[in-house]
Design a protein with these regions (language model features):
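N-terminal-proximal low-complexity accessory segments that begin disordered
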Residues: 2-39
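Feature activates predominantly on carbohydrate-active enzymes
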Residues: 27, 37-179
Length: 179
């Protein structure tokens, strides 16, 4: 795909990217616009997250399609409903945050790329631009504790496993009882 939005459109419905024009423009505020050029719906925004949010808005309020975690694919109509009047939406919220330590340690610790890609798509469609990403924190701890003279066994006894990292990072537990 030529842009992340075209890739997102193709994951939603194969061939859908041909029905849209994506335009990225400079702006000091996050915004998206919906417009029409001939038979193509134009989604314009200042970054890819804003544009993805505009796509979600268009699908919901112009096409009647609601994407959700377990249903990130939809069959778009052969001819998309036209945007009759240009519309613009802005936000004054610079950061739109997602996740907390606990949600990251439930099943997310074991997700593969396909599952993460769906989550990243969902976040972009909903305007999320600051997801918690604590990936690799355990590596930092291993490095620091090693430099402080702890043995590998002591470090392994202290650092929690992937499904327990949230509680470990919040100081609620130490180590984990794996075989």
């Amino acid at each position: 795909a030529a842009s992340p939005i075209e890739g997102l459109l193709e994951r939603i419905d194969k061939g859908a990217s041909r029905k849209f024009m994506i335009e990225q423009v400079k702006s000091p505020v996050d915004f998206f616009e919906l417009d029409q050029k001939g038979d193509k719906v134009v989604i314009r925004g200042n970054n890819y997250v804003s544009i993805a949010t505009g796509l979600n808005w268009y699908l919901k309020y112009h096409v009647g399609i609601h994407l959700f975690w377990n249903g990130m694919q939809a069959e778009l109509p052969e001819v998309l409903p036209a945007v009759k009047q240009k519309e613009r939406h802005e936000t004054d919220m610079k950061y739109r945050y997602d996740f907390n330590y606990c949600t990251f340690s439930y099943t997310m610790a074991f997700w593969d790329w396909a599952r993460w890609e769906k989550e990243i798509d969902w976040m972009a469609l909903h305007g999320i631009n600051l997801p918690l990403a604590m990936v690799g924190v355990d590596g930092v701890w291993y490095n620091v504790l090693s430099k402080l003279g702890y043995t590998k066994e002591e470090i392994n006894d202290f650092v929690a496993g992937p499904g327990f990292q949230a509680w470990w990072l919040m100081n609620n537990l130490e180590g984990w009882g794996s075989p």
